[in-house]
Amino acid sequence: MSAMIEKVLIANRGEIALRILRACRELGIKTVAVHSEADRDLKHVLLADESVCIGPAPAMQSYLNVPAIISAAEVTDTVAIHPGYGFLSENADFAERVEKSGFIFIGPRPETIRLMGDKVSAIAAMKAAGVPCVPGSDGPIDDNKKRTLELAREIGYPIMIKSSGGGGGRGMRVVHSEATLLNAIALTRAEAAAAFNNDMVYMEKYLENPRHIEFQVLADQMGNAIHLGERDCSMQRRHQKVVEEAPAPGITEEQRREIGERCAAACRSIGYRGAGTFEFLYENGQFYFIEMNTRVQVEHPVTEMVTGVDIVKEQILIAAGEPLRYRQSDIQMRGHAIECRINAEHPETFMPSPGKITDFHAPGGPGVRIETHIYSGYTVPCHYDSMIGKLITHGEDRESAVARMCNALRETVIEGIHSNIKLQRSIMRDGAFLAGGANIHYLEKMLGL
């Protein structure tokens, strides 16, 4: 299959590291697991062909420690490095170091990561490629106050001030009237300079009640690009996704084709390679591009379930220089899939709940998939993200996917630590969720936050 990649180093941990290991195994590729001192007992570390400890528990000293990861790749004769999601996956400097050190980076080119990582240049690139964007300042705001106020009137209030280097809900501020605009810009600038070392800010229309809908794309190194349809990730708490599904309720075949084609065309125009996701806000029938994730996403399984495409395997094959194995006409959405993220956290306070899992039982049955690295006796460390797994169900339609999810959540047993399974069960029974098409603020309202 991929003649040139004999060995992959997995620069990540937890469920995604295990997911990557399984894809490598299927392709007959040897694996190297790098891990922190706290992660010696991770499932993929125990399963990998080789493992290398790269540092102490804190991520800064291990999973974000570039020299340690590169030297682990060197001592194991690794051919390619898969960054997973989070950690170094969208770090252009890391991708560059990987390639300069003679390894294949399983992801886009460093310059593409850089282009899409800067919100201002990303939006400019997407506009040029014909992807619909949120009306805004078309670049950073300058010091001309009169022009800034005029522009804000044109866009229309409410307006969001965003810092160019921010993300994940940080470095942004909503302004409802002209009176507070200039002050808000100054505050956001100061915060951005302190947090991201970059005081560039821009403004865009603030959509009051949008849904979060994203499109999955795949592009090879020969300039071919396709989209795999959309996912709805509107069930969020504090900008963190909780439930994701594919396809998005109420999106028409025309909309899917139009926006999906534009995303694929944008990939071709920026020379994208690998798997990627275009995130949109969707309100009143309109899509507005917000950002592109240049990596595999947590919620990729829902797209895999409805399209039958193994996204992680495709990432590896693309990195090996293989052409895409699918044409756009091969991609059909079949049925409906839902994913619930399972977190080790207190159901009421949402505080992380690390500790030893004394008992774990995974659900089963038709159309049920679980992606998790936990097992009975495994200790969830306190140093990393609280997500310990993902439960995915697939059914012939949304109703049957939900019914299967309800069963799967009921069957899942995780003892010894707290989890958000109770929350997920209540979402699956919630009227607005069952109706489909809830907006991104709905879950916080439902929880009374």
Swiss-Prot record:
<feature type="binding site">
    <location>
        <position position="291"/>
    </location>
    <ligand>
        <name>Mg(2+) 2</name>
    </ligand>
</feature>
<feature type="binding site">
    <location>
        <position position="241"/>
    </location>
    <ligand>
        <name>hydrogencarbonate</name>
    </ligand>
</feature>
<dbReference type="Pfam" id="PF00289">
    <property type="entry name" value="Biotin_carb_N"/>
</dbReference>
<keyword id="KW-0547">Nucleotide-binding</keyword>
<feature type="binding site">
    <location>
        <begin position="204"/>
        <end position="207"/>
    </location>
    <ligand>
        <name>ATP</name>
    </ligand>
</feature>
<keyword id="KW-0067">ATP-binding</keyword>
<feature type="domain" description="Biotin carboxylation">
    <location>
        <begin position="4"/>
        <end position="448"/>
    </location>
</feature>
<dbReference type="InterPro" id="IPR051602">
    <property type="entry name" value="ACC_Biotin_Carboxylase"/>
</dbReference>
<dbReference type="InterPro" id="IPR016185">
    <property type="entry name" value="PreATP-grasp_dom_sf"/>
</dbReference>
<comment type="function">
    <text>This protein is a component of the acetyl coenzyme A carboxylase complex; first, biotin carboxylase catalyzes the carboxylation of the carrier protein and then the transcarboxylase transfers the carboxyl group to form malonyl-CoA.</text>
</comment>
<dbReference type="GO" id="GO:0004075">
    <property type="term" value="F:biotin carboxylase activity"/>
</dbReference>
<keyword id="KW-0092">Biotin</keyword>
<feature type="active site">
    <location>
        <position position="295"/>
    </location>
</feature>
<dbReference type="GO" id="GO:0003989">
    <property type="term" value="F:acetyl-CoA carboxylase activity"/>
</dbReference>
<dbReference type="InterPro" id="IPR013815">
    <property type="entry name" value="ATP_grasp_subdomain_1"/>
</dbReference>
<dbReference type="GO" id="GO:0046872">
    <property type="term" value="F:metal ion binding"/>
</dbReference>
<feature type="binding site">
    <location>
        <position position="279"/>
    </location>
    <ligand>
        <name>Mn(2+) 1</name>
    </ligand>
</feature>
<feature type="binding site">
    <location>
        <position position="291"/>
    </location>
    <ligand>
        <name>Mg(2+) 1</name>
    </ligand>
</feature>
<keyword id="KW-0479">Metal-binding</keyword>
<dbReference type="Pfam" id="PF02785">
    <property type="entry name" value="Biotin_carb_C"/>
</dbReference>
<keyword id="KW-0436">Ligase</keyword>
<feature type="binding site">
    <location>
        <position position="291"/>
    </location>
    <ligand>
        <name>Mn(2+) 1</name>
    </ligand>
</feature>
<dbReference type="InterPro" id="IPR005481">
    <property type="entry name" value="BC-like_N"/>
</dbReference>
<feature type="binding site">
    <location>
        <position position="293"/>
    </location>
    <ligand>
        <name>Mn(2+) 2</name>
    </ligand>
</feature>
<keyword id="KW-0443">Lipid metabolism</keyword>
<feature type="binding site">
    <location>
        <position position="341"/>
    </location>
    <ligand>
        <name>biotin</name>
    </ligand>
</feature>
<comment type="subunit">
    <text>Acetyl-CoA carboxylase is a heterohexamer of biotin carboxyl carrier protein, biotin carboxylase and the two subunits of carboxyl transferase in a 2:2 complex.</text>
</comment>
<feature type="binding site">
    <location>
        <position position="298"/>
    </location>
    <ligand>
        <name>hydrogencarbonate</name>
    </ligand>
</feature>
<keyword id="KW-0275">Fatty acid biosynthesis</keyword>
<keyword id="KW-0460">Magnesium</keyword>
<dbReference type="InterPro" id="IPR011761">
    <property type="entry name" value="ATP-grasp"/>
</dbReference>
<dbReference type="InterPro" id="IPR011054">
    <property type="entry name" value="Rudment_hybrid_motif"/>
</dbReference>
<feature type="binding site">
    <location>
        <position position="239"/>
    </location>
    <ligand>
        <name>ATP</name>
    </ligand>
</feature>
<feature type="binding site">
    <location>
        <position position="119"/>
    </location>
    <ligand>
        <name>ATP</name>
    </ligand>
</feature>
<dbReference type="InterPro" id="IPR011764">
    <property type="entry name" value="Biotin_carboxylation_dom"/>
</dbReference>
<feature type="binding site">
    <location>
        <position position="212"/>
    </location>
    <ligand>
        <name>ATP</name>
    </ligand>
</feature>
<feature type="binding site">
    <location>
        <position position="293"/>
    </location>
    <ligand>
        <name>Mg(2+) 2</name>
    </ligand>
</feature>
<comment type="pathway">
    <text>Lipid metabolism; malonyl-CoA biosynthesis; malonyl-CoA from acetyl-CoA: step 1/1.</text>
</comment>
<feature type="domain" description="ATP-grasp">
    <location>
        <begin position="123"/>
        <end position="320"/>
    </location>
</feature>
<feature type="binding site">
    <location>
        <position position="162"/>
    </location>
    <ligand>
        <name>ATP</name>
    </ligand>
</feature>
<feature type="binding site">
    <location>
        <position position="291"/>
    </location>
    <ligand>
        <name>Mn(2+) 2</name>
    </ligand>
</feature>
<keyword id="KW-0464">Manganese</keyword>
